[in-house]
């Protein structure tokens, strides 16, 4: 399932529905555009703390299941933090993560 999520991240990048880099992801959170944030599990404790607080405040899921190298390889750029901006990609990723969507 991890590989499928990484492929979805690459597809979202090519579709222009993913942003990467600390400042841009924080901006997406503040503008309430980010649906889910991926942070490399090898990030510094300060970076992890910053994104935990931001994601908690803006009520966005933070996922740290990948290394920054895995995230970078999936999108073709050297990045440690990514945010999905599209609800469709978010739902597909949640399915892969085992999340059950209850709608209604």
Where are these regions (language model features)?
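Mid-chain, well-packed structural core segment of small domains
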Residues: 52-79
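N-terminal first-folded block
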Residues: 4-39
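Charged, alpha-helix-enriched surfaces in structured cytosolic catalytic cores
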Residues: 4, 46, 50, 66, ...
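N-terminal positively charged helical leader segments and presequences
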Residues: 30, 34-52, 59-61
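C-terminal structural segments of small proteins and small subunits
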Residues: 70-104
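Conserved catalytic alpha/beta core of Sir2/sirtuin-type deacylases, generalized to analogous enzyme cores
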Residues: 1-3, 104
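Structural motif
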Residues: 16, 35-36, 61-63, 79-82
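Short, ordered loop/turn segments at secondary-structure junctions
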Residues: 23, 42, 67-70, 87
């Amino acid at each position: 399932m991890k590989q499928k999520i990484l492929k979805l991240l690459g597809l979202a990048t090519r579709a222009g529905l993913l942003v990467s880099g600390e400042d841009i992801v924080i901006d997406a959170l503040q503008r309430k555009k980010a649906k889910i944030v991926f942070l490399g599990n090898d990030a510094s404790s300060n970076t992890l703390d910053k994104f935990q607080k931001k994601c908690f405040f803006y009520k966005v899921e933070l996922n740290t299941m990948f290394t920054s190298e895995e995230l970078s390889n999936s999108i073709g750029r050297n990045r440690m933090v990514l945010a999905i901006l599209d609800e469709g990609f978010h739902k597909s990723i949640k399915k892969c993560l085992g999340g059950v969507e209850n709608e209604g």
